[in-house]
Amino acid sequence: MDLNLDAPHSMGTTIIGVTYNGGVVLGADSRTSTGMYVANRASDKITQLTDNVYVCRSGSAADSQVVSDYVRYFLHQHTIQHGQPATVKVSANLIRMLAYNNKNMLQTGLIVGGWDKYEGGKIYGIPLGGTVVEQPFAIGGSGSSYLYGFFDQAWKDNMTKEEAEQLVVKAVSLAIARDGASGGVVRTVIINSEGVTRNFYPGDKLQLWHEELEPQNSLLDILNAAGPEPMAM
């Protein structure tokens, strides 16, 4: 199989944003690929825009990075001019405007999440084309196709912070198990009135699904775990 190392860097990706009763939780995997080649196993796909607003990035790594950089700059100017941080809604609509005005060139889907004193915790999904949709939860990236049914069953309104983060970590680990373009570690960002908390979940601490093997220390351990019991002589 030939690898095209000149292919654009793509975050095949699973990104998630969830509201809870005091704020929002954002989550993402960490795999960045170039065609079939894994270019980065531990990339950070949750990018800070302001002190209280973050964005989850999927699609073309270059496109999503440049959009985030422009938005961060404009929001900084907004804060200087108005003397207060931009709201989550303002941040999301600025991304929507950039995505819509450049929709023929950009290949990126984004989830904006944050907390502000006017509306509390908010999640906005901004898919390809520049639509902006406020949602109680949003999922995106190639791994999202495996999660719609899961969220239909597992989502509930007015969750606690702990319940929301557990849901996000479980969902991303499920997508990693099923989606070849998602992988690596799970990162979460919790945003509420008290500030921002970042958490990191390494791959060997994630929940295993169905036929996945428990981690083994050696080839002998793997063979012993997979093989039948030896017959008595």
From Swiss-Prot:
GO biological process: proteolysis involved in protein catabolic process
Enzyme active site: T13 (nucleophile)
EC numbers: 3.4.25.1
Domain of life from the UniProt record: Eukaryota
One annotated Gene Ontology cellular component of this protein: nucleus
Name under which the protein is recorded: Proteasome subunit beta type-6
InterPro entries: Ntn_hydrolases_N (IPR029055), Pept_T1A_subB (IPR000243), Proteasome_bsu_CS (IPR016050), Proteasome_sua/b (IPR001353), Proteasome_suB-type (IPR023333)
Organism in which the protein naturally occurs: Arabidopsis thaliana
Entry keyword set: Cytoplasm, Hydrolase, Nucleus, Protease, Proteasome, Threonine protease, Zymogen
One term of GO molecular function: threonine-type endopeptidase activity
Functional description taken from the UniProt entry: The proteasome is a multicatalytic proteinase complex which is characterized by its ability to cleave peptides with Arg, Phe, Tyr, Leu, and Glu adjacent to the leaving group at neutral or slightly basic pH. The proteasome has an ATP-dependent proteolytic activity.
Prodomain residues: 1-12
KW Hydrolase (keyword) present: yes
The protein's enzyme class: hydrolase
Location in the cell: Cytoplasm; Nucleus
